[in-house]
């Protein structure tokens, strides 16, 4: 990433953790520093990616879409996003704020779906070729609370319809990944919005200070 002039900041977490709100806050903080930004989401963010998203998230494909197919669709969408959107933005000095990235696949497919992490890592190496975020914020929320918050948004999609045990496995895997990768910043999202935003602001302001 050192050859690229922009920065990639990723927001991670379970459903209901407040990722969208966090993305908006980060954009606001960066704009105050006159930093040009774009936002992305996964899966999606490109024409092809949005088509793949509609397949992955569609409840009609419950018990139909094979876990392996889901994994490959996610990486297909991610490749398109990196090559069509993220890298071009970074190369012209824009900062990219992403709602989900690679960590989600490790947590959801590796943890939630119980897929072999070695297979996922091999696929990641092939598809991403070492491409990594400059900063990852993981919003940590209790799965039950997260689903209550997510339900308030409306009808559940295919992923959100999974069992609470599924989300507990994801939550546990996120914690393992954070311990294995100390550069990931974990923020307690069980707290009030004001407290969460204050923590995010502190992390982002320190990151800006060291990268401008």
UniProtKB/Swiss-Prot annotation:
Residues given in the record as ATP binding sites:
13-20
The enzyme's first-digit EC class, named in words, is transferase
Alphabetical GO biological process terms: dTDP biosynthetic process; dTTP biosynthetic process; dUDP biosynthetic process
Q: Which reaction(s) does the protein catalyse, per the Swiss-Prot or TrEMBL entry?
A: dTMP + ATP = dTDP + ADP
Q: Which CDD domains match?
A: TMPK (cd01672)
Signal peptide as annotated in the record: none
Recorded GO MF terms: ATP binding; dTMP kinase activity
- Asked if the record carries the keyword ATP-binding, the reply is yes
Q: Does the keyword Kinase apply?
A: yes
Enzyme Commission no: 2.7.4.9
| Annotated Gene3D superfamilies | P-loop containing nucleotide triphosphate hydrolases
> What keywords sit in the KW lines?
ATP-binding, Kinase, Nucleotide biosynthesis, Nucleotide-binding, Transferase
Functional description taken from the UniProt entry: Phosphorylation of dTMP to form dTDP in both de novo and salvage pathways of dTTP synthesis.
**PANTHER family for the chain:** THYMIDYLATE KINASE, UMP-CMP KINASE 2, MITOCHONDRIAL
- In which family does this protein belong, per the annotation? Belongs to the thymidylate kinase family.
What protein name applies here? Thymidylate kinase
Source organism of the structure: Legionella pneumophila (strain Lens)
Kindly list the organism's lineage. Bacteria, Pseudomonadati, Pseudomonadota, Gammaproteobacteria, Legionellales
Q: Which gene encodes it?
A: tmk
